[in-house]
């Protein structure tokens, strides 16, 4: 995002110290230290409080594979490469997404956008959960680069 949008400042968070270490190497290799801050924390817990309601966009690729699918359908090479923490989204694959719905309104500017990659079999349920909140001006499902429905985009009411 920081490479594609040179005018932006990016705060990236992850629970995994290994993910933060890899992101740090990538950020440094791209010479983005002045615009990309990496924080090892759960969701937005480590983001400075004074930044509340200051973000235009919140992007997340949370663990979204339902536990039963992870155990039965995910190829061994994926499970062997990625830590379970990065894949297992709980019983319905929406555990972290539900938490994002709680914290996103605190972080986003009015009219701000939440973009979340999710398991394609649960996008309708995810959209319904967002719509039930009654605070999103629009909730849409978008395709990923392989033309599969995978991204939920919700715009906070202004």
Located regions from the model:
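S-adenosylmethionine
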Residues: 3-156
């Amino acid at each position: 995002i920081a490479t594609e949008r040179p005018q932006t400042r990016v705060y990236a968070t992850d629970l995994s110290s290994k993910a933060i270490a890899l992101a740090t190497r990538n950020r440094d290799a791209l010479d983005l230290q002045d615009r990309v801050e990496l924080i090892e924390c759960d969701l937005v817990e480590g983001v400075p409080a004074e930044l509340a309601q200051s973000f235009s966009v919140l992007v997340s690729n949370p663990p979204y594979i339902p536990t039963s699918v992870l155990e039965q359908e995910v190829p061994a090479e994926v499970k062997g490469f990625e830590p379970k923490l990065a894949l297992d989204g709980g019983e319905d694959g929406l555990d972290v997404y539900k938490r994002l719905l709680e914290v996103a309104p605190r972080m986003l500017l009015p009219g701000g956008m939440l973009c979340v990659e999710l398991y394609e079999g649960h996008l309708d349920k995810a959209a319904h959960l967002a719509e039930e909140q009654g605070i999103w001006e629009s909730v849409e499902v978008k395709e990923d680069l392989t033309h599969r429905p995978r991204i939920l985009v919700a715009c906070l009411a202004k």
